[in-house]
Amino acid sequence: MNPTQTLFSPGGNSPASSPASHPSSLFPQINNCRTIRDLSQIHAVFIKSGQMRDTLAAAEILRFCATSDLHHRDLDYAHKIFNQMPQRNCFSWNTIIRGFSESDEDKALIAITLFYEMMSDEFVEPNRFTFPSVLKACAKTGKIQEGKQIHGLALKYGFGGDEFVMSNLVRMYVMCGFMKDARVLFYKNIIEKDMVVMTDRRKRDGEIVLWNVMIDGYMRLGDCKAARMLFDKMRQRSVVSWNTMISGYSLNGFFKDAVEVFREMKKGDIRPNYVTLVSVLPAISRLGSLELGEWLHLYAEDSGIRIDDVLGSALIDMYSKCGIIEKAIHVFERLPRENVITWSAMINGFAIHGQAGDAIDCFCKMRQAGVRPSDVAYINLLTACSHGGLVEEGRRYFSQMVSVDGLEPRIEHYGCMVDLLGRSGLLDEAEEFILNMPIKPDDVIWKALLGACRMQGNVEMGKRVANILMDMVPHDSGAYVALSNMYASQGNWSEVSEMRLRMKEKDIRKDPGCSLIDIDGVLHEFVVEDDSHPKAKEINSMLVEISDKLRLAGYRPITTQVLLNLEEEDKENVLHYHSEKIATAFGLISTSPGKPIRIVKNLRICEDCHSSIKLISKVYKRKITVRDRKRFHHFQDGSCSCMDYW
């Protein structure tokens, strides 16, 4: 018999009074069910004995179907039980609404519908547990109008002072982007009441949750300053408070602030947890703070924090982006490798280090392990092909993505292909590829082609592509700078001046070059012609020494990189103070002989700096790693891992 067909029909002659069949005797067994199939067997016993007419029995079955963990949950089954219940009390309504509100967005919409059905039931009134669930559904689905109506109903039924209801109202307004409404509720229910010292721990913890919700809301809107102001006002903070600040700064691109908040957290009495590590590792990766990343890895192991696919992938990404691919491989090999996220992280690590062959090998092993590639895995694989100049392999994998794995290429996949073709000198094919794209190319696609034009010295196509970009993103400096570079390389200074004038008229500024270097856990940041560092005098002396030694080694500055019509000597002086050269000089005076130097650059490393650092690695017998916007450059003994292809 299928229990869902006759959910409440009595059958057989099982005595209702039998201890073996009485609902209360089966409740512990319900809690021990591992699957819905297990539950259906108990459900069948209830039906045969006629006990499903018992409100308590039906509610217990409903509770398991609707609100147990997601692995056991079956909302369709729960909904059938609910619809056929002879009597529904507030608990039953709350249970089914909660179940749907905790599911995906489509099912959360059903929770809202169920709430309105409940309100039309003249025999049932909502209680303090009803509103939080339906408000969660409104927050998840962005149904602000329904949320406001439910807010009014909460007040009507006397729950305006209930901290549980209020916290979910604030969360709903925050998630829907209505920070003004959230702020009014927050200040009325928290800030004004906070004048009195809280002695009730439960209420105090509830208020901390509200503070965290507000901070998260400001971070979601990109208002990091408002979030920080609230955070600083908190008299007590939970680990979630710290995690919210760290993840918020990271998501908004304020990586130094994220790491700084983490350092503050370390000094206090709240220990970082799993979420802390997952939140701060991306910031550490972007800054290249290897020492802090290694500390986190060790902390996780010593604290018994399980390194699962998500945390493991974050560690792989951190080691890869800090230039230590060997440690990334070590982490990867210790993971179960059952999830595509882990494989994708490792493929990306190989890609940014220019190890295209290893990336392809990793991709093939992933297939052999029975893990289906994701669209992200293909982006990383195509990036590896691009950095390795593997045109045929790139074409094959782009085609295989659709024909074998049935994945629809995203704009990022097309961008990888344009980059691959352009870097390989196939500019006409790259342009044709763009024009035949089934989706409209964005500025990133055209920038990839423009970069290839600059690399290949094709000024004619470069002008055409730059004009497209200037129309598409008129206030972006990229097209102006790239075209200026091409004109400067030809000595066409009148056109360079024209570009500079157009930028000035439109108040467009070039992104300043910036290089970071981590010395003993402290980040040092340098910009072009930077003399603000406390050791500026020593750095300048080292730059002079480097210049002298490189000349003796045969170095000649590549002055076509300078976008100014200057005398040759003046151009050399400009190149002398590029941020990556200053960072390299600082690394040489701040570390012992033979120790590796690691630098992170926010832009693409220029040709002259690339040539210089190759020689510096040979003259000073140092391994120097530079991570620019595109990839890693491992300089050693006068050569670079990119083989001068970047």
Curated annotation (Swiss-Prot):
GO terms for biological process: RNA modification. Residues 552-646 are annotated as: Type DYW motif. It comes from the Eukaryota. GO terms for cellular component: chloroplast. Keywords: Repeat. Residues 445-520 are annotated as: Type E motif. Residues 521-551 are annotated as: Type E(+) motif. Residues 1-24 are annotated as: Disordered. PPR repeats lie at residues 54-88, 89-126, 127-161, 162-197, 207-237, 238-272, 273-307, 308-338, 339-373, 374-409, 410-440. Transmembrane segments: none annotated. GO terms for molecular function: mRNA binding; zinc ion binding. Residues 9-24 have a biased composition (Low complexity). Belongs to the PPR family. PCMP-H subfamily. This is Pentatricopeptide repeat-containing protein At5g48910. The gene is PCMP-H38.
